[in-house]
A protein has these predicted regions:
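Glycine-rich phosphate- or other oxyanion-binding loops that anchor nucleotides, phosphorylated ligands
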Residues: 1-189
Length: 190
């Protein structure tokens, strides 16, 4: 659940070259007391049930599909609160917030079961069907996050920076080469 989700974020962050300002989306299924099976929700409040830690992901897309999402350690069947229940969002969020800005970290869930339609047999095909039914909405949010991530990145051009710095200070040829390599690395880290 949440521990494996956090580990996956760490792995993917390292695999991506530890680039900051990238969007992170947790897509999965969740049970909900009242929402219809197949309905998409965007977490606007995430509660880790075991610790009561709470996060409020910034909402970057106007939607009526917002919901509280409770991360439980075991499958929830009683739905005590009118909220969505999953098993990994809090781990994902806690880890992803170390890799990017809060507005670029979102959790999207597709309702898999509720009080009227309890979870009986869930398999990979059914999960694929539930998520597949919401791909257009998921793609819209992903596009919006990608746009936001681009607007968060400072417009850094190594040549422009080199020109500005060498205009202000004197550098030897060796120092210029070192400076250019350092600027290239710095821009990649952002």
């Amino acid at each position: 659940g949440r521990v494996l989700s956090a580990a996956a974020v760490g792995f993917l962050y390292g695999w991506s070259g530890s680039r900051r300002h990238l969007p992170w989306i947790n897509i999965g299924i969740a049970g909900h007391r009242e929402r219809d099976v197949g309905e998409l929700i965007i977490a606007n409040k995430i509660i880790e049930q075991s610790s009561r830690r709470t996060w409020y992901p910034p909402q970057v897309v106007a939607t009526e599909n917002g919901s509280t999402l409770i991360t439980a350690d075991q499958i929830e069947r009683d739905f005590e609160q009118n909220a969505a229940y999953d098993m990994e969002a809090s781990g994902f969020l806690a880890a992803a917030l170390r890799c990017s800005t809060a507005e670029l970290v979102q959790s999207i869930k597709i309702v898999s079961d509720n009080i009227r339609q309890p979870l009986t047999s869930l398999n990979a095909d059914r999960i694929e069907q539930l998520i597949g039914g919401q791909l257009n909405t998921i793609a819209h949010l992903a596009d919006r996050l990608q746009q936001l991530s681009q607007s968060n990145l400072p417009e850094l051009d190594v040549e422009h920076l080199m020109t500005e710095l060498t205009r202000r200070w004197s550098f030897s040829v060796t120092q210029r080469h070192r400076l250019q390599r350092l600027l290239q690395r710095w821009v990649l880290l952002l």
